[in-house]
Amino acid sequence: MCPPVSVRHGARGMSCLYEAWLYHLVHGEQTKICFACFKAAFLLNKLYLEMGDWQEEEEEEEEEDADLLEYLSESESESEQEPGPEQDAWRGLGSLYVPQSVSEGSGVLLPTPVWTQGILFSIFVPTELFPQEAVPLDLGPEDAEWTQALPWRLDGLFPCSHQLIPPLTWWDIFDVMPSPGQPVLLELRCHWPLDQTVAQSWLQDQKFVLLLDSVQSRCHLLSMRVRWVVRTQVQHWQVLLDPGEMWVAHFRKEVGQHGLYHQSLNPWRLSILTASELGMELLPATCYLWNKGFWVGSFLPWHINMPETWSWEPGERLFITDATICGTDYHLAQSFLDSHPTPHPLLTLTP
């Protein structure tokens, strides 16, 4: 399975290598390695490939394996002979140990062949993959460099002590309330069959918003851009939301068609901003996604398990009447609103 790399992510400022690192964190062997160390390992591997060491090392390994088999077969044929004192000294160290010198029947010590000097290291401390064990990493046609088509040998990645930002895997769960600037990882499950291509495209187009706090009719909103959407090996969806601009907004409530009311705005904590007949509306993401065929399994790092009541149809509707952008680019937020035209311009911005 290849990393989800495409021109779309590159247009948003995300490099193909960064996409591969994110994919490794989510779908790899749960190795905690920062992007800087991952990039250094990639560049070192790329340098080896460009130097042409790949084929040469494979040929050397094949020659060493053949010589080792020949040597072991000769040793078995001579096993009936009485071992000398020099052989007794190292016999208990294992059948793969090769001494610095061996004794023939005449008692003369002869040096071992040169090819035996690296046997212990290559057997007990493997540093490379065999060709059949390598996993190809295709970074996409837009980076059609000859080294990209060759198999990677990064199976031996080791964890680093650097901080991982963003926390993308299930073992990176926060025990305290995270800061608003951290990304969010959604795990979605389908409760009816969905077309994979259509579902991925639809999730990419959604405008997620975090409701950070609210006092009476005033609230703080944080827009969350969809970085990528991937289909996991267990047939779930993972959606990475990257924090964007901060808004100070005013909202109003409208009585809905259902009799079930929420005493708080918790169901709107993660919302999707949509255009409706009454203006810009905040829809609870759990309820809206449920109606589209998705069930939110987890909402990291905020919630490991989503409350069941958040998927219920709310008894009221929330509409944004005005919003002021805080500490970000005005034109960026304006483009966000331009993509959601409303019949009634209820949403105004103050640059």
From Swiss-Prot:
GO annotation terms (biological process): cell differentiation; cell proliferation involved in embryonic placenta development; homologous chromosome pairing at meiosis; in utero embryonic development; male gonad development; male meiotic nuclear division; placenta development; post-transcriptional regulation of gene expression
Residue span of region Important for interaction with piRNA: 117-164
Annotated region described as Interaction with LIRE1, given as residue ranges: 1-73
Keyword RNA-binding appears in the UniProt entry: yes
Keyword RNA-binding: yes
Subcellular location: Cytoplasm
Summary of the knockout phenotype: Mutant embryos exhibit intra-uterine growth retardation and have small placentas due to a reduction in the number of spongiotrophoblast, glycogen trophoblast and sinusoidal trophoblast giant cells. They show an incomplete penetrance of embryonic lethality preferentially affecting females. Knockout have heterogeneous spermatogenic defects and testicular degeneration leading to infertility in the most severe cases. During spermatogenesis, mutants show impaired recombination during leptotene stage of meiotic prophase leading to chromosome asynapsis. Knockout females are fertile.
GO MF, any single term: piRNA binding
Inducers of expression: Expression is down-regulated by DAZL protein, which binds to 3'UTR of Tex19.1 mRNAs and probably represses its translation.
Xref: Pfam families: TEX19
Residue spans of biased composition, Acidic residues class: 55-85
GO cellular component, one term: cytoplasm
Domain of life of the source: Eukaryota
UniProt keyword list: Cytoplasm, Differentiation, Meiosis, RNA-binding, Spermatogenesis
Function text: Required during spermatogenesis and placenta development, participating in the repression of retrotransposable elements and preventing their mobilization. With its paralog, Tex19.2, collaborates with the Piwi-interacting RNA (piRNA) pathway, which mediates the repression of transposable elements during meiosis by forming complexes composed of piRNAs and Piwi proteins. Interacts with Piwi proteins and directly binds piRNAs, a class of 24 to 30 nucleotide RNAs that are generated by a Dicer-independent mechanism and are primarily derived from transposons and other repeated sequence elements.
Protein name: Testis-expressed protein 19.1
Native source organism of the sequence: Mus musculus (Mouse)
Taxonomic lineage of the native organism: Eukaryota, Metazoa, Chordata, Craniata, Vertebrata
